[in-house]
Each structure stands twice: as C-alpha cells, then as structure tokens.
Amino acid sequence: MALYRLIYVSQSASGLEYPDLVDILEKSERNNKKVGITGMLSFGDSMFLQVLEGSRRVVSQTYNRILIDKRHVNAELIDFSEIDYRDFGVWSMKVVQLGNQAEVRSIILKYSSSETFSPISMTGRQSLNFLRELTELYQKGVILNT
C-alpha cells in the first residue's frame, strides 16, 4: 500500500482553549487508530501545523473532516506527497503545544524569519523538518505537555 503525507497550517478560532486541544487529541487518537493514520499537531501563537500519514484515501478523508472543524480557520495545504515510510508512526496523533522554551524558539527561528510561530511562511520541507525536530525535543523531555 502506498503511503502519503499531508501537511497543512491553519489559524485557531478565537476563544480556543487548552481543553479544546485535549479534545482534539482524544478524538484524533481514537479515530486515527481505527483507520491507520499517524501524525502530529503542533500549536503555538494561535497557529496550527499538522502532519497526517497514511493511505491516500484515508488521509484525504481525514483532511476533509478537519477542514470543516470550527476550532480553526484559514486552513492551507502546505504539502501532499507520496512517502516511503512514516516519520510519525509512533503516534496515532500527538498534540504539542509550543511554549517559550529556548530550544523551541530556536527551532522556530531556524525555519522562520522570527521567533513567532508562523508556519504559513514555511515550505513543505521546512514544515516537515520543523515537526521532526519538535518530535526530538518531545522525546528528550524538553517539551512536557498535552
């Protein structure tokens, strides 16, 4: 079966709070596990950056459901590619809320023009590398949330 990766960015709707992120995580984990989707959702500075991995059909269907979610606006597709393997296969979904840790801000600055998280300005490759490095920080225990 061919695997695909989809990366998109969106802006949080006004009034989004931490319990909303927990709800997104719980529902995503449950739904994604059933259909073989893996991925990661990062959130900071009112912006979402998410990667989904799985079959083309299931990734497309999942993205279409995400687009109608009222908790975010201005969704924009950054990348949709066939891949050889999953980079985020450990998680049916992981939500990482970006904080002000120096390591996190350093990675943001590495792939952006400022320390403000603005994934809309990232290319597909930059987004993927950002999420990979964020995953490493999480696995090292630097990021301890959601």
Mark where each language-model region is.
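Charge-rich, low-complexity N-terminal segments
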Residues: 1-146
